[in-house]
Amino acid sequence: TLRQFEEADNFGSLIRPDVTDVDGMLKNLESKNVSGHLFLSETHKKVLQALRQADYLSPKYHVVIANPPYMGGKGMNPTLSDYVKRKFPLGKADLMTCFMSSWGMSNNKNGLAAFVTLDSWMFLSSYAKLRQSLLSRNSIISMAHIGWNCFPEGHTYNRGVTFITKSLSNSDQGIFIQLSDVPATVEKDSLFLERKSSKDCRYTKTSRDFLDLPDYILPFWLSAQMMSAFRENIPISEVSEIRVGLDTGDNERFIRFASEVSRNNIIFSAKSKENVEKSCCRWVPHAKGGEYRKWYGNLLEVLAFSPADYRVLSNQGNKLPSRQYYFKEGFFYTRVSSSKASFRYLPCGSIFNSAAPTALDRKSVV
């Protein structure tokens, strides 16, 4: 225990004492009178100080409330980085999630833990195992997803969240309030009180509900029907593979509307670049995202893909990633859109752009 506090200024309250009966040891040592021992007196004081610190940090509390520090791995010194990787592997990406691992998931049974954090841990894939552990053993009984303007400093911090967990069970209903869907300048304290009383943007979920979602993410606003869809259906990732398309680095040279070139110079049925070469055609159908449209369409452009064009594209732009998937059947969507998600059929013989990520049937992918 004494060695643990050698880095107390660095690790702070992330230290979890190895001693189990701190209180008993303290009482025993405090009863000792070593004032007459020249060499023992100072050591006795240091041991008592370390044990008192250990007592403060032992997992004995029924309620823990914390606004932990926000620091990603890049901001940690080597000693601290090594410590959190060893002690808190699920939360090592940020100090705030290390504190969640340390205090939020190890306090007394039926204890409560309340935190103010950023919301990155709710959605990023790097926190998937942390979420799984938290949701499997605890109930989030209350959460306010604040978003911008969550601290008195104003709009400095984005995506804040405050939540309370209860240990032992993950089947208790929790109340979630959405405050992040408004402009950054809106005062969140008054909005919270308004939505709390009106029950607008207020949702109920159990922690167990989120365990059915990909990577155990926490989109608490999803409807019961949407949650059921995730629970009862096969994920697209199990039957298809989503790939990023190409960037030409010079769209004016390599991309045209199909109406701008001769139809006789477009090959619609290519299965490989060799087919393009044999056809003596320069252009192939090209999926480039486009406006909101469901199921079919937005196949208005063609791409220059002759052998000469292929050599140039192999060395500029993003250098033809996913080229082994070109000309295969699939479905694509627009990467950046202000509208709802929409998916469209990509026929065989087409090449997809980076603006149109494409899902391909795993069985057809060689």
Residue ranges of predicted features:
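Class I S-adenosyl-L-methionine-dependent methyltransferase module
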Residues: T1-P59, V63
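Signature of N6-adenine DNA methyltransferases within the class I
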Residues: D55-K273, N298, D309-Q316, K328, ...
